[in-house]
């Protein structure tokens, strides 16, 4: 039975592979692949071949959460997206997951994106920055167009987290708190290998 293989870890078993759940992405007919984290195991001929053997104790007390905030929006930057999108979203969403160009490029046609992003964060809303290149991770400090955002404490850096993992984590976090410091603390806390 699979749950006893890695008792303190959530995983998905498909096509002979055991993958860490927060790192799963749908890629093709084979359904899922693990992004930025190794496969946990494969199963061949009813045999388990383990690749990842770190044992983590199960928490003593299970804590359940009943509150999620579904006001989280994924914004994939494309050349035609205008900064006004932030104004359109502000009445409907509490957080934006910003999928940047490359590993951290944000448009710099003028200062409208900079103003929109800082205005969003300064209004108490949340922005998590990620990439459209999942196997590379996100690093705002690499390109000039991302550097001005890299040191702002209100802009969450997703590093190598998958977009799907960021959505789930932010929905959970924002269901628990609206305090920026607590949001950041929970976001940067590793849960089930969602951050490597």
Features from the language model and the residues they span:
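Short, glycine/serine-rich, charged loops/turns that create anion-binding
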Residues: 17, 79, 134
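A generic, well-ordered mixed alpha/beta core segment in the N-terminal half of proteins
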Residues: 1-9
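ATP/nucleoside-binding phosphotransfer catalytic cores, i.e., glycine-rich phosphate-binding loops
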Residues: 108-196
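Accessory alpha-helical/coil subdomains and C-terminal extensions
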Residues: 11, 20-103, 108-109, 191-196
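A structural signal for short, well-ordered beta-strand segments and their strand-loop junctions
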Residues: 9-14, 129
């Amino acid at each position: 039975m699979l749950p006893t293989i890695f008792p303190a870890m959530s995983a998905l078993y498909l096509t002979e592979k055991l993958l860490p759940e927060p790192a799963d992405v749908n890629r093709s007919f084979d359904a899922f692949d693990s992004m930025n984290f190794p496969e946990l195991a494969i199963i061949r001929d009813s045999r388990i071949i383990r690749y990842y053997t770190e044992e983590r104790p199960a928490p003593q007390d299970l804590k359940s959460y009943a509150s999620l905030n579904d006001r989280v929006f994924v914004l994939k930057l494309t050349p035609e997206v205008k900064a006004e999108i932030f104004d359109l979203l502000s009445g409907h969403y509490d957080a934006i997951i910003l999928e940047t160009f490359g590993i951290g490029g944000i448009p710099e046609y003028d200062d409208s994106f900079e103003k929109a992003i800082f205005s969003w964060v300064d209004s108490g809303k949340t922005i998590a920055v990620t990439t459209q290149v999942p196997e590379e991770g996100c690093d705002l400090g690499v390109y000039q167009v991302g550097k001005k955002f890299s040191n702002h404490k209100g802009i969450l850096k997703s590093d190598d987290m998958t977009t799907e993992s960021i959505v789930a984590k932010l929905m959970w976090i924002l269901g628990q708190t609206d305090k920026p410091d607590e949001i950041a603390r929970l976001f940067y806390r590793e849960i089930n290998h969602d951050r490597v």
